[in-house]
């Protein structure tokens, strides 16, 4: 039946040719199974590995207080939500989490989505339409790019963090045209921080909405509240988006904004309206993790101490590591060389994933290393020494 629907063997041959091309270009992706031991160690084929590739920045996935939050949510409300938020899936836990997120982000309201990807896609496609011009950073996350496409608005992509180019593009547009400037707060593959203060000035000068995706900024930079807080712009940024799945150790996404925007999304965002709500365990874990972040300063302090320590070690090796975030891109270049470094680290008991196109531009393949609050200095030393040894093999 499938062969009939897709044009018989010829269509399957097309798929096979595409996969063969990826193999030839050292760009084939496969799934690799890991069994977590704790926040930084995993097991595979009876061998233990040090995880240096996850976004579990605060190490909260094994935090007893967060696990307890998930268990309490399940015991009180069951294993699943059973419906979409607008039908039957809005439990008291959701309301509590959204109030806490709004308070955390210093906004009037917040709205929880099932993933950060769905939050970006659902928000951008709702607030922008064919009459909107969207100004998007060249290195924005794929979910922002897809949201822009779904909106059917005109997209103007500016070079990465290039304020002068963005200003030039804004000047070409009538002031009364609907405009949206959207950026990652911390860029997921480079680890640098968007110049949000300058973006805000342009949004004000050219009458544009400003949206920031804080997926990798929440729980990592400044006081942990995200990029807007880092720049002192919590009240000025129109839309703050984030995830529950990275620093907060659960799963899900959210949007924080004023009441008008949130109420509008409830009524227009398709990825919100037509999705079954997250499970009570997910929401309970996120609530508990948010409480840990807000009340236990030692967790964020440990992360930032480890970030500084790892940056110092990499700089001593001649690697540029001047950012303030837990993301350390080790630029290699060619796919095959990047895979070779990743394989060397793997043999040394370290998970350091090779990031290749289309996730990053052609010729900019890299090892993306991340450090968390749960790593210790001995582990960081071992990773840096192993990386140095791996680079010598190229």
Where are these regions (language model features)?
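Conserved N-terminal alpha-helix of the aminotransferase class I/II PLP-enzyme fold
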Residues: 68, 72-115
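Conserved PLP-binding catalytic core of the aspartate aminotransferase-like
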Residues: 301-308, 315-349, 364, 373
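Active-site phosphate-binding strand-loop segment of PLP-dependent enzymes
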Residues: 156, 160-212
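PLP-dependent enzyme catalytic core of the Aspartate aminotransferase-like
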Residues: 4, 8, 64, 68, ...
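Active-site PLP attachment segment
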Residues: 229-264
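Amphipathic alpha-helix from the class-I
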Residues: 281-301, 315-317
């Amino acid at each position: 039946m499938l062969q009939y629907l897709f044009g018989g063997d010829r269509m399957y041959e097309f798929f096979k040719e595409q996969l063969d091309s990826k193999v030839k270009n050292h760009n084939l992706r496969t799934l690799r199974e890991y069994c977590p031991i704790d926040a930084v160690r995993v097991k595979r084929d009876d061998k233990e590995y040090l995880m240096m590739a996850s976004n579990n920045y605060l190490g909260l996935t094994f935090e007893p207080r967060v696990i307890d939050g998930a268990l309490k949510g399940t015991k009180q409300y069951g294993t699943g939500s059973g419906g979409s938020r607008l039908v039957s899936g809005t439990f008291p836990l959701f309301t509590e989490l959204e109030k806490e997120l709004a308070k955390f982000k210093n906004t009037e309201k917040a709205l929880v989505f099932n993933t950060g990807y769905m939050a970006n896609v659902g928000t951008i496609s709702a607030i922008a339409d064919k009459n909107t011009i969207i100004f998007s950073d060249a290195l924005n996350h794929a979910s922002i790019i897809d949201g822009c496409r779904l909106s059917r608005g005109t997209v103007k992509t500016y070079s990465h963090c290039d304020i002068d180019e963005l200003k030039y593009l804004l000047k070409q547009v009538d002031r009364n045209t609907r405009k949206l400037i959207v950026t990652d707060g911390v860029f997921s593959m480079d680890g640098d921080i968007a110049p949000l203060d300058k973006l805000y000035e342009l949004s004000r000068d050219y009458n544009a909405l400003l949206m920031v995706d804080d997926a990798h900024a929440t729980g990592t930079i400044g006081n942990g509240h995200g990029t807007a807080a880092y720049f002192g712009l919590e009240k000025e940024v129109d839309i703050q988006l984030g995830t529950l799945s990275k620093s907060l150790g659960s799963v899900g996404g959210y949007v924080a904004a004023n009441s008008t925007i949130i109420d509008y999304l409830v009524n227009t965002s398709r990825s919100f309206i037509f999705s079954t709500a997250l499970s009570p365990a997910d929401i309970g874990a996120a609530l508990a993790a948010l409480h840990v972040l807000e009340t236990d300063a030692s967790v964020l302090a440990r992360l930032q101490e480890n970030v500084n320590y790892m940056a110092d070690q990499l700089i001593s090796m001649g690697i540029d590591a001047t950012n303030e975030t837990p993301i350390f891109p080790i630029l290699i270049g060619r796919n095959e060389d990047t895979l070779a470094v990743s394989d060397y680290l793997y043999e040394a008991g370290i998970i350091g994933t090779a990031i290749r196109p289309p996730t990053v531009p052609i010729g900019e393949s890299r090892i993306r290393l991340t450090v968390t609050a749960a790593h210790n200095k001995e582990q960081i030393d071992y990773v840096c020494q192993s990386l140095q040894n791996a680079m010598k093999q190229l």
